Amino acid sequence: MAAARACIVALALVAALFVAGSAAAAAGNAGGRPQLSLRQRRRQLLRQRQVRSHLKRLNKAPLATIESPDGDIIDCVHISNQPALDHPFLKNHTVQMRPAYHPEGLYDDESKVASQRNAQTITQMWHQNGRCPEGTIPIRRTKEEDVLRASSVRRYGKKKRRSAPNPMSVDPDMLNESGHQHAIAYVEGDKYYGAKATINVWQPKIEQANEFSLSQLWILGGSFGQDLNSIEAGWQVSPDLYGDNNTRLFTYWTSDAYQATGCYNLLCSGFIQINNQIAMGASIFPTSSYSGSQYDISILIWKDPKEGNWWMQFGKDYVLGYWPSFLFSYLADSASMVEWGGEVVNSQADGVHTSTQMGSGHFPEEGFGRASYFKGVQVVDSSNNLGAPRGGLGTFTEQSSCYDVQSGSNADWGTYFYYGGPGRSSSCQ
């Protein structure tokens, strides 16, 4: 009898545990949330640890912090504590605070640009709430949600492969398979030591969060296979990278065709910033409006003939910093091609072309105030002279019915081109 009574008690206990477990499972599934398996929970915890470790490497201790009206947090980090100096080859690097040489003819060109009528002032949004002190650089703080939007921690802040357009390609359809489309002007066939342009600034509409639209210049060396070297700068709208649709200043570099090396802005060791006024990846404003005010930014990238580093200047006042020459193989000497223009990601959701806009979202033939442009397009030659490309510009686009480009030259703008388009339309499916 005692044994039977013990058996009944044991069965009751098992039943109670089963009911409690079922109730807990039901509570866990409230709202339709599926229960994670032990393996899934471990994977989730591992990713969280990886993200937090990555954030710790990227977000250096600031001496001051500025909250931007657009939600960004700008950390003012001591110049000697910036992410670039984490690179093993830069552990004992003495930061070069100014280039040994600027290109010849630069200031003649800027005097001409400054005297043009209807010049509009453009700035960064965080400036409304303060500036970083001397001896620091402004760094846009990376948030946990920024990293979580990436396909992996390792790929955060990196472009997809085959992102640089190859105008020599005989098979545009093959380029379309990469999901990237372009409308560019270019020069090739010589040695180039820099490039400059004034870029019209817009806020193009993005259809899918995993797409982007940018306008930039590319300094290129090597082949379009596994060893491409590229230095890039311009403006972009990229919800996946930044979490919003703001127009932002950006830089990029790679020494292996976007495979393992390089990144946007200061999201890895590479670009050494010296300027305390301009933040890479921060919003720029105002932007141009259709048939309204037009706003431009000017970008110059050149190779210092003495030190060999590649420098970047924003506008006529801000020398931002440099990419050390050791980061590159081909670009350690010179560039073999320079490109300027627009790029979008076409994810082809539902099997149709994206409606993500390039430039202003309007075709080149609409002209000033409606179509986006690059003007004052120049290159730096082997004598460190800045001037118009000899022989003019080549142009390239994969699908001119979606995004197009038209180049020209005149006394006011020098070498220029209009570019862009709406993406999906009656003529672009």
Q: Which ranges hold each PLM region?
A:
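Exposed, interaction-prone regions of secreted/extracellular proteins
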Residues: 2-429
